[in-house]
């Protein structure tokens, strides 16, 4: 592996680590947003139940509708988060692919390089596997979030006059948000594993980068042999 190739491989690993870290932050935001939406939904469900039990049924019906409006706001935030998540996961996938391609070009005749590559290859492979596993889980979460969002949008001003319609929308949104919550929890575990492997990979990549720069520095200090000067001729007689 030439010095330039070593540095390029290390850079690709660093980019993968950054992308996975950003994906992890987005997953945490999704967890917080879904948790907030579920709490809003609990409030809506409570007020919906009071509609039949209280003389102030119309008040609680309107209150439940307001909660669903807040739920729509929470759900409106999630598509952008899931889009950001896929952007980071796709970037991580590309960076892992680039790193593996460059590592395959390694000249393992050098024992130091061979040792570095042997350590890095399996770890960067784990990052790729975890990211590949995260994508379908993220897709499921996005689908459930969208269904919950649709359920919250289905409640119109006319629908608020019908407790049955309201309860149905709350039940649908609750079911889908519950599924999304489970998906995102699983997604969090997968991305955590990817992030841990990515950090280990970045640590090894730092060693590769440092060694490559050291070799460059040593090569630049090596004296360049000068061309032999021509032997002076004896003066002609």
Model regions: which residues?
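Long, low-complexity or tandemly repetitive, helically biased scaffold regions used
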Residues: 2-226
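Long, low-complexity, intrinsically disordered segments
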Residues: 221-237
